[in-house]
């Protein structure tokens, strides 16, 4: 849940999730609809699907235990080097370091070398004798991430009171590296076409064409092409939406129709027991006034 999402946002979701699924086995018996409904509003829904698949695999193939082999762990859906090392360190107390953005920044500043010029795997291997003196490897994994997040912050790090400033080349140097990452923002224009029936329901389908909204329930959605718009569609509103590094400029069109196109289902504009992503909810709110 914490991947790409702030702690304060995650806390209520985490509490509800762990209250509902108290064991790996109970989670493995769930399904996409239930998991996504509980995840609704957190975004990055692939995480939820991967978590469910991981639970099923661990229960079925590993007797509800996390493997000790990094090769086996990386076979789990959505698990790469970072997550695998974090799991081995936190769960099995192995001498591992989970290299996330906070840890990279911490090491990079300590050496006063830009991240792009550091091979972090080689750096850890070279310094493993000093790094892994402790037997509390799980604490080390978490401490490095927390230190980078709370002390060695991206902007305005509090270097004067930092316990590492005696060895930190960033602190001592007059020529400091720049650790601020500029996000590459992409602008995209889309037209969304909403079919609404007399019962105040909207026709939605599972999208498999727009990559950043894959598997979401959406109305018809296409890249903007004013010339191709049928006259039966009425323009409702233009609005902006942001998803990750994308800025979307959206034209919303609608028409009243009781005819349901193939592979579409009716969803209420007001309340849905099934999972509806935030992106689609914004559309529903704009249509309620019709």
Question: Where would I find each of the regions flagged by the language model?
Answer:
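Catalytic cores of DNA base-excision repair glycosylases
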Residues: 2-160, 164-167, 173
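Intrinsically disordered, low-complexity, charged terminal extensions of DNA damage-control enzymes
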Residues: 146-290
């Amino acid at each position: 849940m914490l991947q790409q999402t702030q702690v304060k946002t995650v806390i209520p979701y985490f509490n509800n999730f762990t209250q509902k699924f108290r064991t790996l086995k109970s989670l493995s018996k769930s399904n996409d609809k239930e998991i996504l409904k509980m995840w609704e509003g957190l975004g990055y829904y692939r995480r939820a699907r991967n978590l469910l698949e991981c639970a099923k695999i661990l229960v079925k193939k590993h007797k509800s235990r996390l493997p000790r082999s990094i090769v086996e762990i990386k076979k789990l859906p959505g698990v790469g080097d970072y997550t695998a090392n974090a799991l081995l360190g936190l769960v099995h107390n192995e001498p591992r370091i989970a290299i996330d953005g906070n840890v990279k920044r911490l090491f990079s500043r300590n050496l006063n070398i830009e991240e792009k010029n550091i091979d972090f795997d080689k750096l850890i291997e070279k310094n493993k004798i000093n790094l892994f003196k402790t037997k509390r490897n799980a604490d080390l994994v978490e401490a490095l991430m927390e230190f980078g997040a709370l002390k060695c912050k991206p902007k305005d790090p509090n270097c004067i009171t930092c316990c590492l400033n005696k060895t930190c080349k960033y602190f001592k140097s007059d020529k400091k590296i720049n650790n601020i990452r500029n996000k590459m923002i992409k602008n995209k224009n889309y037209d969304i076409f909403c079919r609404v029936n007399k019962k105040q329901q909207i026709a939605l389908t599972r999208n498999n064409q727009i990559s950043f909204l894959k598997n979401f329930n959406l109305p018809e959605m296409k890249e903007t092409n004013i010339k191709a718009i049928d006259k039966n569609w009425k323009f409702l509103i233009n609005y902006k939406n942001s998803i990750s590094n994308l800025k979307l400029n959206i034209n919303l069109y609608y028409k009243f129709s009781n005819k349901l196109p193939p592979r579409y289902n009716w969803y209420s504009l007001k309340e849905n027991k099934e999972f509806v992503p935030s992106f689609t909810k914004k559309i529903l709110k704009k249509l309620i006034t019709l």
